[in-house]
Structures are given as structure tokens and as C-alpha cells.
Amino acid sequence: MLFLPGRIFVSLFAMGAIAAASTQSPPDAVVAADGSGQYTSVQDAIVKAPQSASAEKPWIILVKPGIYKELIYAQREKRFVHLIGQDPKTTVITFNLGPKMLGLDGKPIGTFHTPTADIDADDFTAENITFENSAGKVGPALAIRVDGDRDIFRNCGFRGYQDTILINRGRQYFENCTITGATDFIFGGAVAFFEKCDIHCTGSGYVTAASTPVSEPFGYVFAHCTISGDSPGLKTYLGRPWRAFASVIYLNTTMSDVIRPVGWFNWDDPAREKTARYAEFNSTGPGANPAARVTWSKQLSAAEAAKITVETVLGGADNWNPIN
């Protein structure tokens, strides 16, 4: 079967229905495959978002519970789209593109053209929805790719195996999300804050593969999160540096014994031990083992950790604060 590479996505199937979601403003679009809404496809509702949407008047899309088998793309012009589901357990956007599938040119589409959800727009928000790539153990297969700035994900699920989430650039905030995968399943060069998220490892591998630019003081920060694993005997690393200056910090995170005592891996490149910026503060649980961690990672003091907040990590030149 041939698939279009790049960001020209076509919805194949959509199934589901919609219920009211928690928002003070009425929805601009309702997605329901049974015909009770305005659209039967999530992508169709995104396409209708006007360029006039703003922080004061976002384009709110309500998605009823259901399994939506489609690819979605929020292009750069589609700012201030709010995609609101009812429950991430019952509202799922899923597809199964793998890197070896062929495009129209007859060549494999590659990793970066596999995402089920491709978010290029700034100021995008998703709540109560799961994004899934169901391709399985086929190599890198993205559930979501994010290139937008000031994007927010609350109470969302992200399911994949390898490279589940590509946060490529910009700033993102993840709150109360569940993220599953095995290898490098949170990766990219963005600045991201993960608050109270559940990280679940389905295979032995690496939680993160950051490619933080040297100019960025922060890369990924995980605060008050939990890390667990599928089965006894499964072992994984907190991260490995995709690029030399990878930055990952875990604050007050509970780690099961899925985490290897050494914590971090140098990607078979000792030179990256001198440049990677890996740190923890107050890790707890069987996987928390400061004394056994690699010597090139850091254990932060309470004073150092106190300075790492949503505001200091994500604020930037525009003082963005996704909590407000």
C-alpha cells in the first residue's frame, strides 16, 4: 500500500461520537461519526479552523468518545485550536504508519513522516484524548510530532513503541498525561515541562533521547512524575543524548525498578559525557539510586531544584505560563 510522505494527510476512517467537555465556551465544531455532530472526522474540523482564532476566541473542537482511525495535521496557520475529548481512555486518534512503508515515490517514508498527529501550529491545546501509533515493533513510529510553540497537552495519552513523541522544537507543557513506549519514546530538540505524568515502559530501552540545542538552558523537565514498566526484568535508562548537549531533569519523580541503577547511557560516545546535561532531584522508589548513577550526571541540591519551575523553563522572551 502506498502512503503520502510529508504532511499531506488524508483521513481514512473515523468512528466515534461526542459529549460535552469541560470548557466555559461553547464548541465551534463537534466531531461525531454517527452524524450527530457537524463533522465525522477530527481532521475535517481542524481544516475549518479560521486564521482569525485567538487566545480570547480559540477554535474549540469537541470530540466524542470513539476510535478515530485517521491522520491529523494542524498546519502552522491553524493557531489556537483546542481539541477537547471527554476521556483519553475512550477517545482515541490512531493510525499505523511505519518508517518502511512506501510513499508515492516508491521509497520508504521514514521516521519523521509517520506521526498519527502532526502539530505544526503554535498555541495548540489538546485535552482528554489519546494519540496512538499502532504500528508496533516496526522501528520508529510516531504517535505525535510537535513543532508548534506554546502547545499544551492535558490529561492526554500517547501510545507507541519506538519514538512515541517527537517534540521537535518550540515549548510544550504536558500535564497529567500517560506516555508509553520502549525506545527513545520522548525525543527531539524542544523545551518541554512534564507535570504529574505517568511514563510507562513497554520494553527495555531509553525513556528520552533529547537533542537540546546548546543555546537552551533547559530541555526536558519531569516534575512529580512516575516511571513504571510492563513486566519484571524489564530494564531501561532515563535517557541517552541524541545530540551532544541533551538536557533532561527529573524532579521529585517516583521510579520503579524498571530504571537501571546507572540511570543514563552515553549512546556509545564517551565525548557526550562531557556535554550532556542530565540531573535529578529527590527521585524516589526502587529505581532511584543516586549512589549508582553515572558520574557524569548530577544530583541537584534543594536550592538548585527550587529554581526549576514552569515559569523558568518555559517562560522565554514572552513570559509564557501555561498554568495561567
List each model region and its residues.
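Sequence-level preference for short, compositionally simple segments enriched
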Residues: 22-324
